[in-house]
Amino acid sequence: MLDLKAVAADFESFERRLARRGEGAVQALAPVKPLAARRRELNVLLEKQKKEQADANARIRELARTDKGAVEGARASLRALGDEVKKTEAELGEVEAELTRLLMLVPNPPHDSVPDGKDEHDNVVVKTWGEQKAYGFTPKPHWEVGEALGVLEWQQAAKLSGSRFTILKGAAARLERAIVSFFIDVHTSRGYTEILPPYLVTGETMTGTGQLPKFEEDLFKTTNEPPMYLIPTAEVPVTNMHRDEIFEASAMPVSYCAFSPCFRAEAGSAGRDTRGIMRQHQFHKVELVKLSKAEESYAEHEKMLDDACEVLRRLGLHHRVSLLCTGDMGFSSAKTYDIEVWCPGQGAYREISSVSNCEDFQARRIRVRYRGENGKPRLAHTLNGSGVAVGRTIVAILEQCQEADGTVVIPEPLRPYMGGLERIAAETFPRGVER
């Protein structure tokens, strides 16, 4: 959430910065201006009324000594003035509540280093690791590879849960567990503390990281009141862990990694990635979260990006990094890198991680701070990134590591987690006859 005082003091500056995101961001900010002006008027009026109250109280004390007959009339005037103060305070409270509601719908202005653009086609590739492998055959997409091996099952998953769900069997299920353990081991070795968070959170927690109120249609929630929400990413509970806390500067940065299932309604994704496991309602991810000093957050952002890329480098998976343009950034982010892994069976680079610096946008909502050099509490900067998506790592392995005979070579770092298994070969599983 934006700082109301800063917005009110220089509305045009925020308007210009948000215009880089598109007209929608400017429109979201527009209603704030007249309400902020009314808030200023009410604060001035309230200050005037309270001074009049103080003067009236002083006059009553003076009359009690000099003219007791006039005291009752003065008290009646004071009561009327008190009613006016209450009326002004009530309107001010309503205005401030509406301003807070409106600011919850305004996205984070982009950092100056973010390129202007409308959508993903305007993103800028900033680095590449590895090369596209040359195959002596036409590589298949992961859904064909997984189906031929018998380790990815969609028909039974649809019977259980509907579309956008998958059952992993045999070596694929083992591969998923291996990837999670490998990712956590790498990140903890690089200074992250492992967290296993709750998967159901409150509406306040979802609001803290920016999913609510704007993106409720993308979330799954329970039917009880008040509802609980299934997390779309471990960023939500982990970032909120330190809500209403103040850190000493010496404790910063605070670095966490967390494995969790993620649940997303995928509203607006009809017709996209309907085959395979790229876009699921339920998937696993290892998330990286940092709380940083404001002046160090962009250095920490680059470190987090490197940490996310490190797991892919160790697995030998060719990938590239793109700096997202203003039109493709997430709501809470000031700057985002996407890590895109090469999928030869699809002939495309596909996102496997987003690494974002949200500056103080989330911290203002959750009120997480640290003591600056002068000892005064200052809002922390929050950073998050996938380290990385587990299902999409399986996609990359099935496509990049496939062989002409249909088997898939398991990257060496994962083999100790899979009992030394070196490749995935076709498996047969028990199955009855549909009736």
Curated annotation (Swiss-Prot):
<dbReference type="InterPro" id="IPR002314">
    <property type="entry name" value="aa-tRNA-synt_IIb"/>
</dbReference>
<dbReference type="InterPro" id="IPR010978">
    <property type="entry name" value="tRNA-bd_arm"/>
</dbReference>
<protein>
    <recommendedName>
        <fullName>Serine--tRNA ligase</fullName>
        <ecNumber>6.1.1.11</ecNumber>
    </recommendedName>
</protein>
<feature type="binding site">
    <location>
        <position position="287"/>
    </location>
    <ligand>
        <name>L-serine</name>
    </ligand>
</feature>
<comment type="subunit">
    <text>Homodimer. The tRNA molecule binds across the dimer.</text>
</comment>
<dbReference type="Pfam" id="PF00587">
    <property type="entry name" value="tRNA-synt_2b"/>
</dbReference>
<dbReference type="GO" id="GO:0016260">
    <property type="term" value="P:selenocysteine biosynthetic process"/>
</dbReference>
<dbReference type="Pfam" id="PF02403">
    <property type="entry name" value="Seryl_tRNA_N"/>
</dbReference>
<keyword id="KW-0648">Protein biosynthesis</keyword>
<dbReference type="GO" id="GO:0005737">
    <property type="term" value="C:cytoplasm"/>
</dbReference>
<feature type="binding site">
    <location>
        <begin position="351"/>
        <end position="354"/>
    </location>
    <ligand>
        <name>ATP</name>
    </ligand>
</feature>
<dbReference type="InterPro" id="IPR042103">
    <property type="entry name" value="SerRS_1_N_sf"/>
</dbReference>
<comment type="pathway">
    <text>Aminoacyl-tRNA biosynthesis; selenocysteinyl-tRNA(Sec) biosynthesis; L-seryl-tRNA(Sec) from L-serine and tRNA(Sec): step 1/1.</text>
</comment>
<dbReference type="GO" id="GO:0006434">
    <property type="term" value="P:seryl-tRNA aminoacylation"/>
</dbReference>
<dbReference type="GO" id="GO:0004828">
    <property type="term" value="F:serine-tRNA ligase activity"/>
</dbReference>
<dbReference type="InterPro" id="IPR002317">
    <property type="entry name" value="Ser-tRNA-ligase_type_1"/>
</dbReference>
<keyword id="KW-0963">Cytoplasm</keyword>
<keyword id="KW-0547">Nucleotide-binding</keyword>
<comment type="similarity">
    <text>Belongs to the class-II aminoacyl-tRNA synthetase family. Type-1 seryl-tRNA synthetase subfamily.</text>
</comment>
<feature type="binding site">
    <location>
        <begin position="264"/>
        <end position="266"/>
    </location>
    <ligand>
        <name>ATP</name>
    </ligand>
</feature>
<dbReference type="GO" id="GO:0005524">
    <property type="term" value="F:ATP binding"/>
</dbReference>
<feature type="binding site">
    <location>
        <begin position="233"/>
        <end position="235"/>
    </location>
    <ligand>
        <name>L-serine</name>
    </ligand>
</feature>
<comment type="function">
    <text>Catalyzes the attachment of serine to tRNA(Ser). Is also able to aminoacylate tRNA(Sec) with serine, to form the misacylated tRNA L-seryl-tRNA(Sec), which will be further converted into selenocysteinyl-tRNA(Sec).</text>
</comment>
<keyword id="KW-0030">Aminoacyl-tRNA synthetase</keyword>
<feature type="binding site">
    <location>
        <position position="386"/>
    </location>
    <ligand>
        <name>L-serine</name>
    </ligand>
</feature>
<keyword id="KW-0067">ATP-binding</keyword>
<dbReference type="InterPro" id="IPR045864">
    <property type="entry name" value="aa-tRNA-synth_II/BPL/LPL"/>
</dbReference>
<dbReference type="InterPro" id="IPR015866">
    <property type="entry name" value="Ser-tRNA-synth_1_N"/>
</dbReference>
<dbReference type="InterPro" id="IPR033729">
    <property type="entry name" value="SerRS_core"/>
</dbReference>
<dbReference type="InterPro" id="IPR006195">
    <property type="entry name" value="aa-tRNA-synth_II"/>
</dbReference>
<keyword id="KW-0436">Ligase</keyword>
